[in-house]
């Protein structure tokens, strides 16, 4: 299945139904009171996280989603039916952004989490609502309000504990194949990895972590070179970054310069991301002796001013890979993920009595001269009358 991590869609909540102007007319009640019902509220649009999805491909071609409009009110005090909501399933880790204002509406980071992204319009009022002691035959109603409409940008950000950084052909995909059951493509040419991939690393029977592999970065990626930096967003939720460095590049380049390129591109993308914990791992030590690998790594670290620990591995042969995974697991256990902001559970949608309706009722509350009508019976002064028919 094609990996799609961005999609722009149009969402439209339902409009509110209009109120009804009606009067009770029966065989022996020729001049009954007002009985026009309210309209129904418009349907809402929700996003809901689904752990069974891993791509936004469902929204690649279907671009418009509209909730149902609320029905208009009817006579006999019948309230219009509320419009049906629509719930759009998205992968866990999806972020919703208003494309016009660039406002982030929220992140869906847990299975089943639901988020309101477009609110339906409020219902209009029927003429029964305008009945009073001085307005006994009201012929006023209100219209339903329009529902929210917006262009919504969906961004999928993979939820992983560990993110892999490095130039093309540094051995990131080979590393993931060595430590997990994931099988990303591996070849001897740059940009073999074209889309992000996830692998679950099982350290023991009770501990595991998720590692994310993204396409390699090159110099100028922040300006669009190579595959650009569009995939770096998948590392924003990682707890630690593994910077994989080819200790002996086949093109003869300086590994220290290669590391500086990655650091520069990372900083240009996001200062916050560049400040995440980052571990230095030298790969492909199977191409030389252990003594030569240690000496070369020490020289590279001195050139960079790297004062923290670093690791030597061979992803192809599996050498020193297990100790690295155990240290990563210990770090993850010692540094639990910060609690995600809890989304407030959506309340049950009920009929709203908002200022919109109150203001319109006030406009007609004391219009003695204009609204007086003798088309009423004495029973109408008792308020809203509900008629029950067998």
Swiss-Prot record:
InterPro entries: G_OBG, GTP-bd, GTP-bd_Obg/CgtA, GTP1-OBG_CS, GTP1_OBG_dom, GTP1_OBG_dom_sf, OBG_GTPase, P-loop_NTPase. The keyword Nucleotide-binding applies. Its cofactor is Mg(2+). It is found in: Cytoplasm. One of its GO terms (molecular function) is GTPase activity. It is an enzyme of class 3 (hydrolase). Keywords: Cytoplasm, GTP-binding, Hydrolase, Magnesium, Metal-binding, Nucleotide-binding. Residues 363-382 are annotated as: Disordered. Its main location: cytoplasm. GO terms for cellular component: cytoplasm. Coiled coil: none annotated. Residues 366-382 have a biased composition (Acidic residues). Residues 1-159 form the Obg domain. It holds the Pfam family MMR_HSR1. GTP binds at residues 166-173, 191-195, 213-216, 283-286, 314-316. One of its GO terms (biological process) is ribosome biogenesis. Belongs to the TRAFAC class OBG-HflX-like GTPase superfamily. OBG GTPase family. PANTHER family: DEVELOPMENTALLY REGULATED GTP-BINDING PROTEIN-RELATED, MITOCHONDRIAL RIBOSOME-ASSOCIATED GTPASE 2. An essential GTPase which binds GTP, GDP and possibly (p)ppGpp with moderate affinity, with high nucleotide exchange rates and a fairly low GTP hydrolysis rate. Plays a role in control of the cell cycle, stress response, ribosome biogenesis and in those bacteria that undergo differentiation, in morphogenesis control. This is GTPase Obg. It comes from Haemophilus influenzae (strain ATCC 51907 / DSM 11121 / KW20 / Rd).
């Amino acid at each position: 299945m094609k990996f799609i991590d961005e999609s722009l869609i149009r969402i439209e909540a339902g409009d509110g139904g209009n109120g009804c102007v009606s009067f009770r007319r029966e065989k022996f009640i020729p001049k009954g009171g007002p009985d026009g019902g309210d309209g129904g509220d418009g349907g809402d649009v929700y996003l809901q996280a689904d752990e069974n999805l891993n791509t936004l491909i469902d929204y690649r071609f279907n671009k418009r989603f509209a909730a149902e409009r609320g029905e208009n009110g009817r006579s006999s005090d019948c309230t219009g039916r509320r419009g049906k909501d629509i719930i759009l399933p998205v992968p866990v880790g999806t972020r919703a952004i208003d494309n016009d204002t660039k406002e982030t509406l929220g992140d869906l980071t847990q299975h089943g989490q639901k988020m309101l992204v477009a609110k339906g319009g409020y219902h209009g009022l029927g003429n029964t609502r305008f009945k009073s002691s001085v307005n006994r035959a009201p012929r006023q109603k209100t219209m339903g309000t329009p529902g929210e409409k917006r262009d919504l940008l969906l961004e999928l950000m993979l939820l992983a504990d560990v993110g892999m950084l490095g130039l093309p052909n540094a051995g990131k995909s080979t590393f993931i194949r060595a430590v997990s059951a994931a099988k990303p493509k591996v070849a001897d040419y740059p940009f073999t990895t074209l889309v992000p991939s996830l692998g679950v690393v099982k350290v023991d029977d009770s501990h595991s972590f998720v590692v994310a592999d993204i396409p390699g970065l090159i110099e100028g990626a922040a300006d669009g070179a190579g595959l650009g930096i569009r995939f770096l967003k998948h590392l924003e939720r990682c707890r630690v970054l593994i910077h994989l460095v080819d200790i002996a590049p086949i093109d003869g380049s300086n590994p220290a310069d290669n590391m500086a390129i990655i650091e520069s591109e990372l900083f240009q993308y996001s200062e916050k991301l560049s400040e995440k914990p980052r571990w230095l791992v030298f790969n492909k030590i199977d191409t030389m002796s252990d003594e030569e690998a240690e000496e070369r790594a020490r020289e590279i670290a001195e050139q960079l001013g790297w004062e923290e620990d670093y690791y030597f591995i061979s992803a192809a042969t599996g050498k020193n890979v297990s100790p690295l995974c155990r240290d990563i697991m210990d770090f993850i256990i010692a540094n639990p993920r910060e609690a995600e902001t809890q989304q407030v559970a959506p309340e049950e949608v009920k009929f709203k009595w908002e200022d919109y309706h109150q203001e319109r009722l006030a406009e007609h509350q004391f219009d003695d001269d204009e609204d007086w009508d003798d088309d009423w019976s004495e029973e109408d002064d008792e308020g809203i009358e509900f008629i029950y028919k067998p």
